[in-house]
Amino acid sequence: MILDFKQIEETVMPNFKGGEKEMAAKMYADEKTRIMLNRLVPGATVGLHTHEGSSEIIYILEGNGKVLYNGEEMRIEKGQVHYCPEGHEHSLINDTDADLVFFAVVPQQ
């Protein structure tokens, strides 16, 4: 299967997971996995949440920002991956003046 994100419509989600501002996403989902190309606008956040029944892999394609992971804050930049296993909490923060673009995969347990 080939997923062509150029052909998938972008959906804008205000206050995603209780976060600030908005995240735009191009998504594919089936019963086992969600695959997303996401964009956090400057100043936007993905709200702090715990993964129950899934994990998440985030690969930064453009920009940089911060990850909150189990109470620890760390910087993340283009080319790096953040992994949040099931049962752990995290948030992604774009604290810059440029879009933060990332690829995310959420396999369902």
Region locations from a protein language model:
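Structural motif
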Residues: N64-K66, E73, E89, D99
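Short acidic-glycine-tyrosine-enriched beta hairpin
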Residues: E72-E86
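Ligand-binding loop in jelly-roll beta-barrel domains
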Residues: E86-Q109
